[in-house]
Amino acid sequence: MLVSCAMRLHSGVFPDYAEKLPQEEKMEKEDSFPQRVWQIVAAIPEGYVTTYGDVAKLAGSPRAARQVGGVLKRLPEGSTLPWHRVVNRHGTISLTGPDLQRQRQALLAEGVMVSGSGQIDLQRYRWNY
């Protein structure tokens, strides 16, 4: 069985998220939901965003958008997974306060235009997986 891409992500083996997952790293049926979420989020290219719902759909659970948020919220401190590339279905950052600003700054650093209120133009920046 393949070593989970997600586990390698957290060990720092896949620092370059700008490339999609190689063919041999495709998700396995046995992968847990969090593992599938990690793999999908890792594949979002720099300068693009996707929605919690899109990630859930790609993970095989189209009604699990909130669970995607929960998986990302529980990432360990210092995780290199690009969690900041996931926004709500309206193209808005769902976080508030300092967390909103942290996500906004990370996206701005990648060239994604984000309004002061956390709004992103999904037509321009949405990842077309």
UniProtKB/Swiss-Prot annotation:
Effect of residue 83 to C: Does not confer alkyltransferase activity
Coiled coil location: none
GO molecular function term, any single one: damaged DNA binding
A Pfam match: DNA_binding_1
Keyword DNA-binding: yes
Chain's role: Involved in DNA damage recognition. Binds DNA containing O(6)-methylguanine and larger O(6)-alkylguanine adducts, and to double-stranded DNA that contains an AP (apurinic/apyrimidinic) site. Binds to the damaged base and flips the base out of the DNA duplex into an extrahelical conformation, which allows processing by repair proteins. Works in partnership with the nucleotide excision repair (NER) pathway to enhance the repair of the O(6)-alkylguanine adducts larger than the methyl adduct.
Other facts noted in the record for this chain: Does not have alkyltransferase activity. A tryptophan residue replaces the cysteine at the known active site of MGMT.
Name listed for the protein in its UniProt record: DNA base-flipping protein
Gene transcribed to yield this protein: atl
